[in-house]
């Protein structure tokens, strides 16, 4: 989510923007402000990262659970509890945060929502059950959301999924796909890669130019696959809703 917003904010000329997971926030950056994204507001790495920021630096928390530990260490908090969800895997919270922040910088969120709604009735293609490897590609915002899509497939399906910038894919990773692979391009840029992908025997889905709407389409596809495979999408193995280290309980 943060990668997508940072990319779009810079492309819109709103200023240099960084994106880091809580565990990788560097020291010494001269930021004017920070936005901390957390559905639960309890993950140790995020809370610790905010605590370590310079005193007086404005920090806005976008949090799905009010009254959380993160809410106690940020300067101000935007309550997104309406977008919270019981599932371990984030879908609604993610698309809500993306819509909010991308919309601030000019993204046509209403158009994306309309396109996304049209995807909700799509059925799985007949060949979906044959796919063993999922690859997501995009540029700019699409590249960031390709990583988000790949993460969702790993979490929901415990399957091999990857995300790459479209132009980088030909530099090596394309060699690992074949007839049991699906390559999903989230935007409409770089059509020249399509034939190279098809030549490997892989299936190809090409987005319609709106990576935010396409992310919802990908969620719908994943929902169909978990039904097909008999998986509980709300409780995937080995992961929890929040990662709280023992010393912070």
Where does each model-flagged region fall?
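Catalytic-loop motifs flanking and including active-site residues across diverse enzymes
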Residues: 1, 5, 96-100, 145, ...
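Anionic-ligand anchoring segments at beta-strand to alpha-helix junctions in alpha/beta enzyme folds, i.e.
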Residues: 1-32, 132-178, 223
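Glycine-rich phosphate-binding loops that contact phosphosugars or nucleotide phosphates
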Residues: 1-120, 139, 182-207
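Internal, active-site/partner-interface "lid" segment
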Residues: 65-66, 72, 102-132, 231-249
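Short capping/connector residues at structural and topological boundaries
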Residues: 169, 174, 179-182, 236-238, ...
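Short amphipathic alpha-helix initiation/capping segments at coil-to-helix junctions
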Residues: 176, 186, 190, 210-214
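Phosphate-moiety recognition in structured ligand-binding domains
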Residues: 196-249
């Amino acid at each position: 989510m943060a990668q997508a917003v940072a990319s779009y904010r810079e492309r819109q000329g709103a200023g240099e923007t960084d994106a880091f997971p809580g565990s990788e926030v560097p020291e010494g950056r001269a930021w004017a402000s920070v936005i901390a994204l957390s559905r639960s507001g309890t993950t140790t790495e995020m809370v610790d990262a905010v605590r370590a920021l310079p005193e007086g630096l404005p920090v806005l928390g976008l949090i799905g659970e009010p009254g959380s530990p993160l809410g106690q260490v940020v300067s101000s908090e935007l309550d997104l509890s309406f977008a919270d969800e019981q599932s371990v895997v984030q879908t609604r919270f993610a698309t809500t945060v993306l819509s909010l922040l991308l919309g601030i910088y000019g993204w046509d969120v209403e158009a994306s929502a309309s396109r996304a709604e049209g995807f909700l009735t799509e059925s799985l293609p007949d060949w979906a059950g044959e796919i063993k490897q999922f690859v997501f590609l995009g540029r700019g915002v699409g590249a960031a959301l390709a990583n988000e899509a790949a993460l969702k497939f790993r979490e929901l399906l415990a399957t091999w999924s990857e995300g790459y910038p479209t132009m980088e894919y030909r530099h090596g990773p394309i060699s690992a796909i074949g007839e049991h692979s699906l390559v999903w391009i989230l935007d409409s840029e770089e059509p020249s890669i399509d034939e190279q992908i098809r030549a490997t025997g892989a299936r190809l889905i090409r987005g319609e130019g709106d990576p935010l709407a396409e992310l919802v389409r990908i969620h719908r596809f994943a929902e169909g696959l978990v039904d097909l495979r008999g998986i509980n999408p709300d409780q995937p193995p080995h992961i929890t809703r929040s990662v709280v280290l023992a010393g912070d309980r």
